[in-house]
Amino acid sequence: MGSRSSHAAVIPDGDSIRRETGFSQASLLRLHHRFRALDRNKKGYLSRMDLQQIGALAVNPLGDRIIESFFPDGSQRVDFPGFVRVLAHFRPVEDEDTETQDPKKPEPLNSRRNKLHCEFVRTCTNAFQLYDLDRDGKISRHEMLQVLRLMVGVQVTEEQLENIADRTVQEADEDGDGAVSFVEFTKSLEKMDVEQKMSIRILK
Amino acid sequence: MLRAALSLLALPLAGAAEEPTQKPESPGEPPPGLELFRWQWHEVEAPYLVALWILVASLAKIVFHLSRKVTSLVPESCLLILLGLVLGGIVLAVAKKAEYQLEPGTFFLFLLPPIVLDSGYFMPSRLFFDNLGAILTYAVVGTLWNAFTTGAALWGLQQAGLVAPRVQAGLLDFLLFGSLISAVDPVAVLAVFEEVHVNETLFIIVFGESLLNDAVTVVLYKVCNSFVEMGSANVQATDYLKGVASLFVVSLGGAAVGLVFAFLLALTTRFTKRVRIIEPLLVFLLAYAAYLTAEMASLSAILAVTMCGLGCKKYVEANISHKSRTTVKYTMKTLASCAETVIFMLLGISAVDSSKWAWDSGLVLGTLIFILFFRALGVVLQTWVLNQFRLVPLDKIDQVVMSYGGLRGAVAFALVILLDRTKVPAKDYFVATTIVVVFFTVIVQGLTIKPLVKWLKVKRSEHHKPTLNQELHEHTFDHILAAVEDVVGHHGYHYWRDRWEQFDKKYLSQLLMRRSAYRIRDQIWDVYYRLNIRDAISFVDQGGHVLSSTGLTLPSMPSRNSVAETSVTNLLRESGSGACLDLQVIDTVRSGRDREDAVMHHLLCGGLYKPRRRYKASCSRHFISEDAQERQDKEVFQQNMKRRLESFKSTKHNICFTKSKPRPRKTGRRKKDGVANAEATNGKHRGLGFQDTAAVILTVESEEEEEESDSSETEKEDDEGIIFVARATSEVLQEGKVSGSLEVCPSPRIIPPSPTCAEKELPWKSGQGDLAVYVSSETTKIVPVDMQTGWNQSISSLESLASPPCNQAPILTCLPPHPRGTEEPQVPLHLPSDPRSSFAFPPSLAKAGRSRSESSADLPQQQELQPLMGHKDHTHLSPGTATSHWCIQFNRGSRL
């Protein structure tokens, strides 16, 4: 951690990134540190290989998809601003509208609800993109099947898996088009206490 | 101790018992020879009294719940304490001295463990670990804070002269008192919060705290107690260090003991495949052993049992059979609720003991105020710290509820009773104060917390059904977060949870779960499985609704629907396929599902006619003989089959008869008969039943080909009927086997020639024949879409096979006596499935379902099914033709 001060100078466009993503200086430093650690050959960007080398990610059933989300539009590399931008999706929302948030000063209920709603929508977006591989704004049965194949750990046959996929799509599908749209997706998430489920506290 | 405590419950009995008990004990007398009658009260006294007390407590509970109004306003614990007060008063008045108090020994060894086990076992583990940080903070820091501040403040109060000088206590005594009075009590918290239904997070924090603070309480109490006994002068610096160290030893040791026993328990249940009957016992035995072991090593016993329950649940539930699971659940709940009831009642009784009361207003008031004040202060301070780290901060309202929910209870009381009067001269004052505090928190706070929660609009817990989407998304979220933490390089909570889950999957589950259980252990799969079964049931339900909405409303409809529903539900439940139908029952929240189940159960009990019983000598102690229910099912089935066989035979003969008769007359009779019957059944087109269609089919298959053709020529309706039967069945089954089905004579084949594998596995099915197999294959495979087709078939077949005449159907019961009366009641049974046939799925789907279903004896089975599937033809008939048509069939079927 002694090298922290030296890093501060190194971050290119540190301020603009911070403004864009809302990360604090400390987290940005931490991320930059991490970025450089992942960047094996000091090439200044990360390739898929770099991320695939994270051990725990390899066992994660969704690891590949998470990695993929760092490389939009099929690009081969991600630089630091891009890296941070992706991670910003997982930052707890509170910073923007509650810069001065303090237990002493309770915000009006409305704004809190607003905030929760923001967070909810953002969470949904995050998750939705993970399902929607072809980016057509819908989770088709095929896409659902792929996710399920990753997620269901037990030995089920392909046929059973298809049945589960059918069932899952049917459950969420309200307009009967055989696919889950974003609106339908958010509806299926409404019952869960989502707001706390898609943020990582450390990314403040 | 229990014996001592309860020995005088016999007061009402005493008069009766007194005299006879003297007899056998009077010494010196020569033995009076053979006694015809001997009164041995003393030999049964202790257990008898225990049983009596529990009975009294249970009866009291029943009485309380007779009035919904009272229980919705007043928590049960309050009522029980008040009842205890009354009972104690009576005992005091009769015996002139207080008896049957809450003995610490009884409390800690017998009454507390079931409650803690219950709460540990049914603790929502995910929620618990998600909030573990907060829980631990409140449990450890909070309890320490409460103990020290309360003790010190009381001491300050004494120094200020506000406590009467006759309370001889030093700082250490007050700290000791503070340590025992500061702990939030799990029993009281559970009793009150279970009725309040605050949101899950709040509940788990308060409740988890009350469970985990036991370790702190035990340590504090023991340390202070030994300090007091040593005398403050002799306490050395190392003793303080030892005190701190013992906190870790007691808590971690207790948890370790619990986990070890959880491991043992899980491992043991892995090998109980052949002795299912002792599975529930194992759970209780090993958990209790954990408690006793921890108690023996003077570790935190509550922590041990909590961890044991928490740790073993996943594996035990996967290992033990479905029935054992239900048994464990109910036994645990019963024991816990029983213990809780007795505790509160005895608490009430214990308060009526004038010898205990050494009142000091300053001490009592001071304690009450300090407890409330420091609890609130502690909660606010800790929450402030915690909120710096929590993603979802605990807001003000939560804090109020948490402060106010700090109830004290029987643990504090038992601890204060355990004090040694010679070492702690102020014991009596402490006891009195504790009683007041306990009563105040349980009664006043318990009474007011519900209105408070309502008034503050605390987020309530909402219970919703699990959906596949939620389950799936929850898992995805976990994985996403773990992955992001990996990328960020921060090893936080999600990271470790992910690690743990992988470890669990790789090693622990493999070691502790049965192979068969391990293979199918997946939460998404689980939810899917349950959802399907629920859907199946609700589909059957819906079938009824759809039916009534199509305009075919008949008075007997609902009852018949329910018959179908119950029989299917029942079959499913009996199938032992490992599925729990009662999704909600698993949770502690009572829901409408239970009631629904109960209603169904009663309906079934009332609706099924009681078959002749065959008494089998089944007295194996190690294996449960098949249920009465199963036996009944079998009997019903057999009787139905017998009847059907007869009816088939008789219809054959009938056909010969009818053929020889002149047409016009026949139609006339047909009409008349039909009208009579239809009128009897309720004046609508109710004559339809599978017998009739079966009869039609039989006409086709009967040997007299020429007569058959003759009838088809002359009678349009008949002809139509035949055609439709054939087409409908072929449509449903998509096999083009119509002619085959017509050639097959169903009666001899009704019992399948060779048992399918499902039959071998599930013995109860053997009696049900192929149809049951059909159902089971559908349910275990769980095919979502085409399941409906399967259900159509199985339901219709089940109906015709297993549904007996229901006495709730007024029409059925008021049928006029008929020549072939035995068949009559069954005649209308087939109607409700008609609309269901309109649910028929596209042929391809139906086919897929079939191919997936049990294929061993498939084709013959289908063919056998066809007579039963006759209802399909109904959909093709216009009402007008239907009427006359049914009449004809009816006539045939019922003629002798």
From Swiss-Prot, chain B:
Residues 660-672 have a biased composition (Basic residues). One of its GO terms (molecular function) is sodium:proton antiporter activity. It is a multi-pass membrane protein. One of its GO terms (cellular component) is synapse. GO terms for biological process: monoatomic ion transport; potassium ion transmembrane transport; regulation of intracellular pH; sodium ion import across plasma membrane; sodium ion transmembrane transport. Residues 1-45, 95-103, 156-173, 222-246, 298-331, 382-398, 450-896 are cytoplasmic. Mainly expressed in brain. Expressed in neurons of the central and peripheral nervous system. Expressed also in testis, spleen, and skeletal muscle. Changing S711A: Abolishes SLC9A5 phosphorylation by CSNK2A1 and abolishes CSNK2A1-mediated binding of ARRB2. It is found in: Cell membrane; Recycling endosome membrane; Cell projection, Dendritic spine membrane; Synaptic cell membrane. Its main location: membrane. Residues 67-73, 125-134, 195-200, 268-276, 353-360, 420-428 are extracellular. Residues 854-864 have a biased composition (Polar residues). Phosphorylated by PRKAA2; promotes its accumulation at the cell surface. Phosphorylated by CSNK2A1 in a manner favoring its beta-arrestin binding and endocytosis. ATP-depletion almost completely abolishes SLC9A5 activity. Inhibited by amiloride compounds. Changing S709D: Abolishes SLC9A5 phosphorylation by CSNK2A1 and abolishes CSNK2A1-mediated binding of ARRB2. Keywords: Antiport, Cell junction, Cell membrane, Cell projection, Endosome, Glycoprotein, Ion transport, Membrane, Phosphoprotein, Postsynaptic cell membrane, Sodium, Sodium transport, Synapse, Transmembrane, Transmembrane helix, Transport. The chain crosses the membrane at residues 46-66, 74-94, 104-124, 135-155, 174-194, 201-221, 247-267, 277-297, 332-352, 361-381, 399-419, 429-449. Residues 576-721 are annotated as: Required for interaction with ARRB2. Pfam families: Na_H_Exchanger (PF00999). PANTHER family: SODIUM/HYDROGEN EXCHANGER, SODIUM_HYDROGEN EXCHANGER 5. Interacts with CHP1 and CHP2. Interacts with ARRB2; facilitates the endocytosis of SLC9A5 from the plasma membrane. Interacts with RACK1; this interaction positively regulates SLC9A5 activity and promotes SLC9A5 localization to focal adhesions. Interacts with SCAMP2; this interaction regulates SLC9A5 cell-surface targeting and SLC9A5 activity. Belongs to the monovalent cation:proton antiporter 1 (CPA1) transporter (TC 2.A.36) family. Plasma membrane Na(+)/H(+) antiporter. Mediates the electroneutral exchange of intracellular H(+) ions for extracellular Na(+) in 1:1 stoichiometry, thus regulating intracellular pH homeostasis, in particular in neural tissues. Acts as a negative regulator of dendritic spine growth. Plays a role in postsynaptic remodeling and signaling. Can also contribute to organellar pH regulation, with consequences for receptor tyrosine kinase trafficking. NCBIfam families: b_cpa1 (TIGR00840). This is Sodium/hydrogen exchanger 5. The lineage of its organism: Eukaryota, Metazoa, Chordata, Craniata, Vertebrata.
